[in-house]
UniProtKB/Swiss-Prot annotation:
This is tRNA N6-adenosine threonylcarbamoyltransferase. Binds 1 Fe(2+) ion per subunit. Its cofactor is Fe(2+). The gene is tsaD. It catalyses: L-threonylcarbamoyladenylate + adenosine(37) in tRNA = N(6)-L-threonylcarbamoyladenosine(37) in tRNA + AMP + H(+). CDD domains: ASKHA_NBD_TsaD_bac.
């Protein structure tokens, strides 16, 4: 049994977890900063860094105590080194390297995006070849995995990410940050009375685009305000969310038709969206040889448990880093050969 302690601090969650064999979560301590950033309508990097410094030791102690694990029982330290905010990443990275040095443990560098996908193993084992739809505030990508720990981006957003669009529409409607959950709840109370565009629906690729949709929503609201018309926010939320989900489902369907896979993973913060989960479940019914594995709801957001899961992939392939490991804020998926 391999026990890995993992550190995550790429954005506005400070988290430390202990994961066994890549799929058993012994502890997952998370300190969120949502309340601190809500009044700004988004993450303020300097504020995030200060909070990480305040919380890193506390979540570390909590993770160890909750798991009832002594440092000597650990096999390695996994840490997110990118992508993310450089100041935030540095706090987790320094914490992880300090812990590793103090206890003589090897350091495993982990791509934050790979962590989101690896969290599907907390649901059930991913079978390969597999495909993942990675949807978050900063990323919207279709990723093909011919084998474990190997990633090939076959489709990506050309402008805004899906989660970014939710937050921008949320700000337009004066909703609290982050707006995804609130819009999802509103969408269940509204009707799709507004026809918003689904970009690139007929293009022969797997890419996404959400900037046109965002602009259409902004224009709709501005025109209504100019005419002093009352906007039914629930109907707008329903219409907007339908357009986002339609785009995600359409590209996913095209990809599944052209890349037969055994597992399909839904990962990232937007993976918590109820409509997206429901419609992907229905879509996968048309692909009986492909098992749908959504990341469990409690692991869709940023957390260290998912970093431990991805860290286990690297551990098995002897992918370790020296203590001079640095952050890579712009890190994307890498094609890793075994």
């Amino acid at each position: 049994m391999t026990k890995i302690i993992s550190f995550e601090s790429s954005a506005d969650e400070t988290s430390v977890a202990i994961v066994e064999d890549g799929h058993i979560v012994l502890s997952n301590s998370v300190a969120t900063q949502i309340n601190s950033h809500q009044r700004f309508g988004g993450i303020v990097p300097e504020v995030a860094s200060r909070h990480h410094i305040e919380w890193i030791t506390r979540v570390l102690n909590d993770a160890l105590n909750t798991a009832h694990v002594e440092p000597k029982a650990l096999d390695a330290v996994a840490v997110t080194y990118g992508p993310g905010l450089v100041g935030s990443l540095l706090v987790g990275l320094m914490g992880a390297k300090t812990f590793a040095l103090a206890h003589g443990l090897p350091v495993i560098p982990v791509n934050h995006l790979a962590g989101h996908i690896a969290a599907a193993n907390f649901n059930k084992p991913i079978k390969y070849p597999a495909m993942a739809l990675m949807v978050s505030g900063g990323h919207t990508e279709l990723v093909l995995m011919r084998e474990e720990n190997q990633f090939e981006v076959i489709g990506e957003t050309r402008d805004d990410a899906a989660g970014e669009s939710f937050d921008k529409v949320g700000r337009l409607l004066n909703l609290p940050y982050p707006a995804g959950k609130t819009i999802d709840e509103m969408a269940h109370r509204g009707q799709p009375t507004i026809k918003f565009p689904t970009a690139m629906a007929h293009e022969d690729n797997y890419d996404f685009s959400f900037s046109g949709l965002k602009s259409a929503v902004i224009n709709y609201v501005h025109h209504a305000n100019q005419k002093e018309e009352t906007i039914n926010q629930n109907d707008l939320a329903t219409s907007f969310q339908n357009a986002v989900v339609d785009a995600l489902i359409g590209r996913t369907k095209r990809a599944l038709e052209n890349f037969p896979v055994k597992s399909f993973v839904l990962a990232g913060g937007v993976a918590a969206n109820s409509q997206l989960r429901e419609e992907l479940t229905m879509l996968l019914n048309d692909f009986p040889k492909t098992e749908f594995i959504p990341v469990p709801m409690q692991y869709t957001g940023d957390n260290a448990a998912m970093i431990g899961a991805a860290g286990y992939w690297n551990y098995k392939k002897n992918i370790f880093a020296d203590l001079d490991l640095n952050t890579d804020p712009g890190l994307d998926f890498e094609l890793l050969q075994s």
